[in-house]
Curated annotation (Swiss-Prot):
The lineage of its organism: Bacteria, Pseudomonadati, Chlamydiota, Chlamydiia, Chlamydiales. The keyword Ribonucleoprotein applies. This is Large ribosomal subunit protein uL22. GO terms for cellular component: cytosolic large ribosomal subunit. The keyword Zinc does not apply. Transmembrane segments: none annotated. GO terms for biological process: translation. NCBIfam families: rplV_bact (TIGR01044). Pfam families: Ribosomal_L22. GO terms for molecular function: rRNA binding; structural constituent of ribosome. This protein binds specifically to 23S rRNA; its binding is stimulated by other ribosomal proteins, e.g. L4, L17, and L20. It is important during the early stages of 50S assembly. It makes multiple contacts with different domains of the 23S rRNA in the assembled 50S subunit and ribosome. The globular domain of the protein is located near the polypeptide exit tunnel on the outside of the subunit, while an extended beta-hairpin is found that lines the wall of the exit tunnel in the center of the 70S ribosome. It comes from Chlamydia felis (strain Fe/C-56).
Length: 111
């Protein structure tokens, strides 16, 4: 199994989990196709992490990309950046800028 992570990505975890659902239990080739046609920002981020995991497999163990499956996709919440927006009469309202930690694990297909 080969793993790649991206941390502190400025994508809301809730939206990133939608993109992660597109690639679960697929072969790497199919997952890359799904993510390349996705219009979600999280889809682009997950595709980069998936490509990194595949590169780890190819460089470290000489495994071909056609033999790999997506075993696990995990989207965890990262820290939240807190900002405020000015409102009328001297008030303000909070703005929460959420971040995500993305983890993709790939491995060889079972025969």
């Amino acid at each position: 199994m080969f793993k790649a992570t991206a941390r502190y990505i400025r994508v809301q975890p809730r939206k990133a989990r939608l993109a992660a659902g597109l690639m679960r239990n697929l072969s790497v080739m199919e997952a890359q196709k799904q993510l390349s046609f996705s219009q979600l920002k999280a889809g682009r981020c997950l595709k980069k992490v998936l490509d990194s995991a595949v590169a780890n497999a190819e460089l470290n163990e000489n495994v071909k990309r056609e033999q790999l499956n997506v075993i696990e996709v995990r989207v965890d919440a990262g820290p939240v950046y807190k900002r405020t927006k000015s409102k009328s009469r001297g008030g303000r309202s909070p703005i929460l800028k959420r971040t995500s930690h993305l983890t993709v694990i790939v491995g060889e297909r079972e025969r």
